[in-house]
Amino acid sequence: MQEVARLHRKVRNQRQNAHHQLSRRLVNQFDLIAIEDLKIKNMVRSPKPRPDPSNPEVFLPNGAAAKAGLNRSISDAGWAILLSMIGYKAESAGRTVVTVDPRHTSQRCVVCSHVARSNRAKQAVFKCQRCGHEDHADLSAACNILWTGRAQLARASVG
């Protein structure tokens, strides 16, 4: 039992150390840090059962096993702790942290602003259906998050 507790403590310390290093690097490197306002509770929700239309007593596969692994990964990441560290370090360093509505950040083209679910036909590739712009999906989403964060900050400073 003590061995298990020791291993859990070791993992917790490693995660906390990684969070401290990443948050320090971000705060030292950037004046503005824009973060998606993700609802983690919604992200780790279990998939709904899918009843078989031809036999109501039987349920069809709903991807619950794969979703359970993703849920565990999301929960283990400790995002709330990382965001908290970024927040207090940014405040003490005079940096700005902006939370951004996550809607359409991965579907909006950074070139022409066209929003379509079909812009993300593949998980890792973004390809705009209007202008043809192609990019890594995560990079495109990060640019949209930053752009939205800058726009929010500009609106807040004006009015």
List the predicted regions and their residue ranges.
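Positively charged, helix-rich recognition surfaces that bind polyanionic ligands
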Residues: 1-159
